[in-house]
Amino acid sequence: MEANQAGSGAGGGGSSGIGGEDGVHFQSYPFDFLEFLNHQRFEPMELYGEHAKAVAALPCTPGPPPQPPPQPPPPQYDYPPQSSFKPKAEAPSSSSSSSSSSSSSSSSSSSSSQAKKMDPPLPPTFGAPPPPLFDAAFPAPQWGIVDLSGHQHLFGNLKRGGPTPGPGVASGLGTPTGTPGPLTTPSQTPPGPAVGAACDPTKDDKGYFRRLKYLMERRFPCGVCQKSFKQSSHLVQHMLVHSGERPYECGICGRTYNHVSSLIRHRRCHKDVPPTPTGGTPQPGPALPSLGLPVSTASATASSDPAAVSSGPSATPATPATSTDGNTTPAAPPGVAMPPSATTGGDGPFACSLCWKVFKKPSHLHQHQIIHTGEKPFSCSVCSKSFNRRESLKRHVKTHSADLLRLPCGICGKVFRDASYLLKHQAAHAAAGTPRPVYPCDLCGKTYSAPQSLLRHKAAHAPPVATEPAKDGAASVPQPPPPFPPGPYLLPADPSTTDEKATAAAAAVVYGAVPVPLLSAHPLLLGGAGNGGAGGPGAGGPSKTFCCGICGRAFGRRETLKRHERIHTGEKPHQCPVCGKRFRESFHLSKHHVVHTRERPYKCELCGKVFGYPQSLTRHRQVHRLQLPCALAGATGLATGQGTTGACGPGAAGTSGGPADLSYACSDCGEHFPDLFHVMSHKEAHMSEKPYGCDACGKTFGFIENLMWHKLVHQAAPERLLAPTPSGPQSSDGGSSGGGTDASSVLDNGLAGEVGTAVAALAGVSGGSEDAGGATVAGSGGGTSSGAERFSCATCGQSFKHFLGLVTHKYVHLVRRTLGCGLCGQSFAGAYDLLLHRRSHRQKRGFRCPVCGKRFWEAALLMRHQRCHTEQRPYRCGVCGRGFLRSWYLRQHRVVHTGERAFKCGVCAKHFAQSSSLAEHRRLHAVARPQRCGACGKTFRYRSNLLEHQRLHLGERAYRCEHCGKGFFYLSSVLRHQRAHEPPRPELRCPACLKAFKDPGYFRKHLAAHQGGRPFRCSSCGEGFANTYGLKKHRLMHKAEGLGMPGTGGSALAGKDP
């Protein structure tokens, strides 16, 4: 009997659901409440009225519970048990309800007979039970005519006055926290106003909407970027953008995200590969590791799961691995390091073991390593040509289909090979006043303005795709879709061109929402696997049913397809209210706002550099991550000396001596050095190429870390990155006495080359409370504590929870602040930082030029600017007498007379007169140019450029003009030649001076000269000009006439003063 009452309480007697009496605030959830209400189903008003009358007739005051008979202890629930509820004695029929499954298995035959009464009880005023209003999964609604009963556990205790639910009406869960708790009796119900027929609905509705308005207000602002949010949980999720944390990890592939919605969206890629727990067979329902855990716990879970480890990207390096989209990724050959397993490390960096190049994702590293191996796994089935990248294969396939896909314009008849170019061409007709052509449907006559819209419409007329019955639980195999009908914008196929190459090349047009395997030989174009196209039986990834009718690209969501189609149509619906610039995506518009506001809320904690976008800050942080000792040790293969704890030992973690106490050895010659900085400087002696150059002095380096340290020389002399910190209790073998595993043991287990794992171990994010891959604890106590601040600064004593936070903080003590502000006394390390700080004391630009109106911060800047309006040239050359505005211009000019080229390139021995010219020249050597011409020895970066160059030696003119048949070597030459065949442009004549122009740009500049003022005047004749360029040309005329200018002596060369 008690079990039945408990089941009744679970069905309708809980007091903490939506219709409960307590006034706890509405719980925070990451979605908009009003958006949720807009997507609910509505029930007929008549049915709700009948049910409301039935519920209102029930008594409002619960009676005392009866004494339960002795029964065995209740079973353990997987969900929170609910409080029992029993009405008054005058309604005996309402005391019985549906029994739970647990009571039917343990009670006597009398209780089993009561379990057969499954219908909900009704008050005695009803002669017959009313018809069922709702399904079992969706009980009667509690808030008007909106059915919210299926989502009561999401809304906590936000209540609205209404009829008290009866025993047969569900009212939510009894324990909002989701943990099992004790049963709640009616005497424990919190006090509140009486509800029922005597309640005032108007007064309670006011309170309800007042609470709803409280929830809709944005009361939680961000302290970094001042963005505000409605709920505190949204603010917590937003702060991950500034901190860079990615706590949600995928249990299958190991990718991490900073929002749970991004992880859920990513999980759709693995929906055909369900996670297999350690039991063997897949379990029904979503498991906790499959939904993603924070990195501190998910990594340990994934590492203990054999199935999860086997699904990582580097589980089977000897065999080709299958990616999430179903395509086969070639395995790395022997000698090439595979990226670290996604279940053991963070999100990077991943270093190449051959060239030490660092990548953020393991897929990028694997794609890069194909360059070293020379492997070309992607081959064309038409001409058997191989490529090392999938994108190169996609571009190559289009060359085979170029003869078939010729799309004519319906207005002028011009033919295009790409539908996107056709749409842009038709937009030019629309801008000129010519209406764009429409595309009618052959079946119903409906017209559309874009061809892809017609293709989606024709999918509705197509018959449904027949499927074969599944065998042994396997997925059903779709039948081949109907052939693609000839569209109104496609030319009919020529029967003479239907050979094997043309048939294979024309294989990829997607018809509506049904993927047609046009390119069956190249399923990579449609994102499928095997030869079955995007939806074939071999596809291991999710089906992409929404395909673009122009380029054939497939998408999994209709919204993504609509956004993609804007690329072809050129539609830009989002416009900037300040400058009027339009964008395709709202995200691009939000990024564009930084141009007008000049806000840079994202600041690097290491160097203080500010950025306007979080992506720029994330890319910038990768530069500093290479300064970590473990990152350097893992990326360059440094060997530690004997008797030390290694690069990742306690010394690096700030628990023992500083870097000077460690001995680092060069892996090439074995020479020992006190710290990593000297090792990196020494290893450059073994390198032949030094691609990183300093823009200030021209010195080159082999590592970008050395270049970063060198740039501090131009500002201040840097101290060491890692200072000694107080050491904690250590064991005799150098490890932590608390029993934790230090990072050196992790490196000894084969992870020394995996930079991402070493960095994650230093940051303390992969070991949970024990931190199996982290560093030892600083301070008192031998054990580790996940909540304590473990790393302390030896200079100021500030402590941090993670080692990365300590390294970030030590930059404050790294540089010497020698330049002080004369107004506030604040010191800075560089002159540029001091200049930026001085501007904060100036409220406005108070120095204005009386000639042109330009404003300046300081009087010295104004005086230098006023030289443009006068004849003053204080810096003159002693050889030719030419005058200059600035001394820097004079130093550059003197090279013309001396002929000195003091800057020499160390690679090709070429000399330059200026250091900036040498720095620009060195960029050519930094980029590899492996393609060499056998005839003249000229090198190129890409093979396509080499093939285009070799046409000069062969005399082949591959590009010909369509009008006159003249041949050219380059495409740019034929495009420039075809302008002569175009009709002459209309002559643009100025209405003020009747001067004619052919170029609209020059015409607009000329009109601006009439409309604006002429602040630049000649001192000889008083004529004014709109810019300095016109004034300079005018001065040359005076020189030729012999009028003379001050200090020139009649020399024509002196007229070239800048």
From Swiss-Prot:
Keyword list, A-Z:
DNA-binding, Isopeptide bond, Metal-binding, Nucleus, Repeat, Transcription, Transcription regulation, Ubl conjugation, Zinc, Zinc-finger
Name the species this protein comes from: Mus musculus
In terms of SUPFAM superfamilies, this protein maps to: beta-beta-alpha zinc fingers
The entry's family comment says: Belongs to the krueppel C2H2-type zinc-finger protein family.
- Where are stretches of biased composition, namely Pro residues? 61-78, 120-133
Where does this polypeptide localize?
A: Nucleus
Gene Ontology terms, MF aspect: DNA binding; zinc ion binding
Task: State the name under which the record lists this protein.
Answer: Zinc finger protein 865
Cellular component terms (Gene Ontology): nucleus
Q: Which InterPro entries match?
A: C2H2-ZF_domain-containing (IPR050636), Znf_C2H2_sf (IPR036236), Znf_C2H2_type (IPR013087)
Quick one: where is this thing mainly located?
Answer: nucleus
